[in-house]
Amino acid sequence: MNYEREIKKRVHNEKWCVTNEQYEYANQIKMVNDISNGSETDITKIAIQEINKKIAGYKHQDKLKKLFDENNFLTFDSVINKMIECELKCRYCLREMNVLYDISREMSQWSVDRVDNNLGHNIGNFHLACLDCNLKRRRRTDEKFLFTKQLNIIKQDTQDTQDIKDI
């Protein structure tokens, strides 16, 4: 039996005229900055549409879980500002994230990660994280997960330690 997941392309991407180059990180950052500056191009229009679609999904989630707070729910501008602030890098693993992606369930896609999962996707209650970290964090606290993701264990060479003792 083959347990490897089949890589599925996103169907609606076929309608886009997006080059492989436009999926690259540097171009995704430029695209976010262009959106922030009000530049309208074919690629920014697609990105705006995709961001709004994802925000609508978070709104739907909050309504289902009875967490929706109309006065505090995140906005398009709050998401764009957060993308610029974090330079489109995951809060936890610092991976470069994608706004546009062509593979379903792309683990490097941006996602909204709630600081307090008992609250909705509200301004002041979210960071941006890659989908991989967002799914792995589950119900752990934001700070504990951040600590485990950015923890660097330094292993000393025991031979160097022995040489120092001999001196």
Residue ranges and their predicted role:
Residues 1-19, 66-67, 121, 153, ...:
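Structured catalytic/translocation cores of nucleotide/phosphate-coupled proteins
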Residues 45-92, 118:
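Short, charged surface segments at domain edges that flank catalytic/cofactor-binding sites
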Residues 95-128:
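Histidine-centered nuclease catalytic patch
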Residues 91-94, 132:
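Short, cysteine/histidine-rich loop/knuckle motifs that typically chelate Zn2+
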Residues 115-127, 135-167:
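Polybasic, low-complexity binding patches
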Residues 1-61, 78:
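Mixed-charge, low-complexity interaction segments
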